[in-house]
Regions:
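Glycine-centered hinge/linker elements that transmit conformational signals in sensory
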Residues: 210-215, 255-284, 330
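Short, solvent-exposed loop/beta-turn-alpha elements that line the ligand-binding surface or hinge
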Residues: 141-159, 222-232, 250-268, 315-320, ...
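Conserved C-terminal helix/tail region of periplasmic/extracytoplasmic solute-binding proteins
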Residues: 35, 41, 193, 409-464
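Extracytoplasmic/periplasmic substrate-recognition and gating elements
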Residues: 193-195, 266, 274-281, 316-383, ...
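Long, aromatic- and glycine/proline-rich binding clefts that accommodate carbohydrate-like moieties
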Residues: 49, 325-328, 376-429, 433
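Extracytoplasmic/periplasmic solute-binding protein
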Residues: 169-178, 183, 205-258, 299
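Hinge/lid segment of periplasmic solute-binding proteins
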Residues: 47-58, 127-184, 223-224, 322-329, ...
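Extracytoplasmic "Venus flytrap"/periplasmic binding protein-like
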Residues: 84, 88-158, 193-202, 298-301, ...
Length: 464
């Protein structure tokens, strides 16, 4: 029971302090978009009447306040796009943006503002935050499907499947995607070839063979200080844990709750702990970054988020390393997986005119042209298939990003429960605890189920 209470306490603290903020799924492609952005509403020869019962004239001068978590380059891009929308949109809608600096502040300040009617009309927040705000959130489905102001079927099918379905729960669309990312296995292909491996591992046995070979190579070199290194650099991030669990046929969500104690999750935990016990996976001290360790050949495999790829690339340059590294999904025996996660545009209930104005801005930001600018700025996943048509040069200049994008068809969504913002911390703590060599020097047959059971009990408490 003490262990469960620690889980819950850490989850509650971290849920407030660390609300973190991602081949394409084959679908019919839309015609190549124009190079010129279109701010005006799409025209058709015989436009159908809107079902929203809003006079277009009533939109003129309508003010929409938006809170976002970004700073630096992302904030500058967002505010630049807002300036463009304000200057060119045919309805005379005015968007006002305010940065809150991070997702924790978005959650805290929005939750407080909803109690005293001072909330903005739109926030960029995590999908699980929208679920926590419940009935205050505007269902975007009537707007998306409106004959005059919505999206057509080709536009909607252009969105990557795992991205598009992430914001819809029980028939209500709580948001529209803003950014998506994922974590990947990074693999030093040059070093692997020198170890005798011509291709990345395709099975769990091949993964073990390669990480253990890297460890043996460092054991046998002239430097005694690296004898415990060489395989997979263990990463306890919740999305890394969830990716491994999916790869083994497990997961986190079952209906309206969680189930960590499952055969797939047990198998994942036991397999990874066994690698650590063989010294083929290891936990690093925080004195060097993941990229620095990877570039220095301290690990054949590391795990990183898509937004960290540029840092890894810079680490190789700083180390004067010409090694080739590539991005891979998390591989199990029967499936390769990544977990796609990130932020969404969330609109709130207000008057009919403001709601429509909010939607028209959201729709505009989701154009392929605008999304291409976001990819170039943040280096995250494209939300739409057609966005890739505008990113040929970016793909050439960022080959690891281009590789990562091909795995979007392997994407799994995060749990669609408001408690996920807290239960995510439980998963991370449980996964990290398993690799604690003092608490768990050897993972006996029954220890993995015990850890997962404790995680289930903590998750059940947080999901009430």
């Amino acid at each position: 029971m003490k262990f469960i209470k620690i889980f819950i306490t850490l989850a509650l603290i971290a849920g407030l302090a660390n609300a973190c903020a991602p081949a394409i799924t084959p679908v019919a492609q839309t015609p190549l978009p124009s190079a010129t952005k279109q701010v005006a509403a799409t025209k058709t020869p015989t436009p159908a009447a809107s079902r929203l019962e809003v006079e277009v004239e009533a939109l003129r001068g309508k003010q929409v306040n938006v809170w976002h978590p970004w700073f630096g380059a992302e904030a500058n891009l967002f505010e630049s796009q807002i300036k463009e929308f304000n200057a060119a949109n045919e309805w005379g809608i005015v968007i006002n943006a305010e940065s809150k600096g991070n997702y924790s502040e978005i959650l805290l300040q929005t939750s407080a503002a909803l109690t005293d009617s001072s909330a903005p009309q739109i926030v960029i927040a995590l999908p699980e935050h929208a679920l926590a705000w419940g009935d205050d959130v505007l269902d975007l489905n009537p707007y998306m499907h409106d004959p005059e102001f919505g999206m057509n079927a080709l536009d909607m099918s252009d969105f990557v499947s795992v991205v598009w379905r992430q914001d819809e729960v029980d028939g209500k669309r709580f948001g529209a995607p803003a950014q998506r990312t994922a974590r990947f296995m990074l693999y030093n292909r040059t070093w692997a070839r020198q170890l005798g491996f011509d291709a990345p591992p395709q099975t769990l046995a091949e993964f073990e063979a390669q990480v253990c070979a890297a460890h043996v190579a460092l054991m046998n070199d002239s430097d005694p200080n690296n004898n415990s290194l060489g395989g997979w650099l263990i990463d306890a991030n919740a999305y890394t844990a969830l990716s491994w669990m999916f790869a083994f046929g497990g997961g986190a969500q079952v209906e309206d709750g969680y189930r960590f104690l499952s055969p797939g999750n047990v198998a994942a935990f036991k397999y990874l702990k066994a690698l650590q016990q063989k010294s083929c996976a290891w936990v690093a001290a925080p004195n060097l970054s993941v990229g620095e360790r990877f570039a220095a050949r301290q690990a054949l495999f590391v795990t990183a988020g898509l937004g960290e790829f540029s840092d890894v690339a810079r680490a190789f340059v700083a180390a004067n390393s010409a090694d080739e590294w590539i991005a891979l999904p998390f591989s199990g025996e029967e499936r390769d997986e990544i977990v796609v996660y990130g932020s969404s545009f969330i609109a709130f209930q207000s008057d009919a005119e403001t709601q429509l104005a909010s939607w028209l801005f959201i729709r505009w930001t989701l154009s392929p042209e605008n999304q291409a600018e976001w990819v170039k700025s943040a280096g995250l996943l494209p939300l739409r298939n057609s966005t890739l048509d505008l990113l040929a040069e970016y793909s050439t200049d960022h080959p690891q990003w281009a590789q990562a994008v091909t795995y979007l068809s392997n994407g799994e969504a995060t749990p669609q429960l408001s408690s996920w913002r807290l239960v995510r911390v439980v998963l991370e703590d449980g996964f990290r605890d398993m690799f604690d060599v003092i608490r768990h020097p050897d993972l006996t047959e029954g220890q993995a189920p015990v850890i997962l059971t404790q995680m289930d009990e903590a998750a059940d408490e947080l999901n009430k």
